[in-house]
Amino acid sequence: MPTNGHKYSILMPTYNEKDNLPIIIWLIVKYMKASGLEYEVIVIDDGSPDGTLDVAKDLQKIYGEDKIVLRPRGSKLGLGTAYIHGIKHATGDFIVIIDADLSHHPKFIPEFIKLQQEGNYDIVSGTRYAGNGGVFGWDFKRKLISRGANFLSQVLLRPNASDLTGSFRLYKKDVLEKCIASCVSKGYVFQMEMLVRARQHGYTIAEVPITFVDRIYGTSKLGGTEIIQFAKNLLYLFATT
């Protein structure tokens, strides 16, 4: 895929990802360079106590300040505000949102971009629940929670997307800004609300099947508090959309 005249800002919120960060950055550089695409990676670290920011600074020295942009914050303030913070510093006209824990393989980013260009879609979302998409590394309980949450979300919200709880997506920058401005949720529910608001705005959404792999290094941030918050916000969205 030759350079297409666009620039892609890859937003990567981090918290305690010092072991994963060098690998995910290396993979992003590999696949974006091979595709001939113009890009930057914006690392938004929320005061990680494990030294993630120091690792990011070392990676910036290796790949250059034009490719690795550091925009840290002092404390853990949530995904939604992390994206808002990152967008303020993004110089691309498209935004890619990706997790830093290696759950999302950067090899899919060029596929997102190719599909977006073919249909001029506003959003391209990675899906674990359509085509040859799937999840690897989760135990039965985690799969059941994810499937159940996604099914319930589909029934209540009808978002016209098969994977409402995923977070690996490509947005037109202005579309992302408008969706975020409409959102009230924080944490993991934020991703779900984004697609619901996109549907309300009439934006077009396409999907690319992805393989989601559970993190190798570090610990998952999903806990009981997040699940309860998810349920509350799901009911709120159902009542207001």
From Swiss-Prot:
Cofactor note: Binds 1 divalent metal cation.
Protein origin, superkingdom: Eukaryota
UniProt-annotated binding residues for Mg(2+): 101
GO biological process terms held by the UniProt record: dolichol phosphate mannose biosynthetic process; dolichol-linked oligosaccharide biosynthetic process; GPI anchor biosynthetic process; protein glycosylation; protein O-linked mannosylation
Annotated Mn(2+) binding sites: 101
Cellular compartment(s): Endoplasmic reticulum
Record's catalysed reaction(s): a di-trans,poly-cis-dolichyl phosphate + GDP-alpha-D-mannose = a di-trans,poly-cis-dolichyl beta-D-mannosyl phosphate + GDP
E.C. designation(s): 2.4.1.83
Major localisation: endoplasmic reticulum
Keyword Membrane in record: no
Keyword Manganese: yes
Pfam families for the chain: Glycos_transf_2
Swiss-Prot/TrEMBL keywords: Endoplasmic reticulum, Glycosyltransferase, Magnesium, Manganese, Metal-binding, Transferase
Pathway given in the UniProt record: Protein modification; protein glycosylation
Any GO MF annotation of the entry: dolichyl-phosphate beta-D-mannosyltransferase activity
Cellular component per GO, a single term: endoplasmic reticulum membrane
PANTHER family from the UniProt entry: DOLICHOL-PHOSPHATE MANNOSYLTRANSFERASE SUBUNIT 1
Role description: Transfers mannose from GDP-mannose to dolichol monophosphate to form dolichol phosphate mannose (Dol-P-Man) which is the mannosyl donor in pathways leading to N-glycosylation, glycosyl phosphatidylinositol membrane anchoring, and O-mannosylation of proteins.
Recorded family membership: Belongs to the glycosyltransferase 2 family.
Protein name: Dolichol-phosphate mannosyltransferase subunit 1
Native organism: Drosophila melanogaster (Fruit fly)
